[in-house]
Amino acid sequence: ESNEHYYMFLGKSSPFTSGTSGGSDTSPPTPVDDITSENYRYDSMLGLNKIASTDVARVINRRTFVSGTTYDMYEHNISTSNVANNSSATSLFDSTFYFITSEHKVYKVLYNLNSSTGNTQALSSEPTFTSPVKQFVGGYYLQYMYTLSTSEISKFLTTDFMPATTDSTVSSAAASASGDTAPFNGAPIDVFLVTSQGSGYPNGTYYAKVQGDGTGGILKIVVSGNAITYFGESGVSTVQAAGSGY
């Protein structure tokens, strides 16, 4: 409710001992939810601070860019039966599909496979672009997400966590590209996977219309050496027209 207030307090200046509150300083007791314990917490308070809306932020696990690291690519259906393609994470939460750079820019990995071998590859070049247009950097296909503000860095960025925020330009571009003001109702096609290159195909460039719940998607399929090339930046298979509503 609008009239509710939250506070963070400090207390318990004396050591934890088995003869008083139980446990020890290195292994404090598990908090108990009862009236006696609640009263004790109030009695031991030394100071408190009111928490304003600007003192709270949504955070995610911090994943710092390190040159030469192989990151996962984003997949919406990561599970025990479909593990992440590099880290073998079994959930999106544990997948390493994003990272923060030395300039506090955050990027999402849309594709991490080598266009020649189809295997995962390390990312050596630190990206710097801030355009909402997706770009290839060091063989990775990346989406710029946002840059942390000075305030967010000083208040919420730690060794373990980083703020999850929104860049209005990026979100507006995503909504526009989806053809809908609610981008989660559908989106353009950014990436596709070649699960098998096959063999014996006539060399050349071909185009295939994407069948599905969206419209306008067209794939450019390049055959070289009588095999379908993997998705990549240039001279290989790629998305000719992203379409919308998928």
Regions found by a protein language model. Name each.
Residues G138, L142-Y246:
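Conserved, function-critical positions that sit in or immediately flank catalytic
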Residues E1-P183:
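Tryptophan-rich substrate-binding surfaces of secreted polymer-degrading and adhesive proteins
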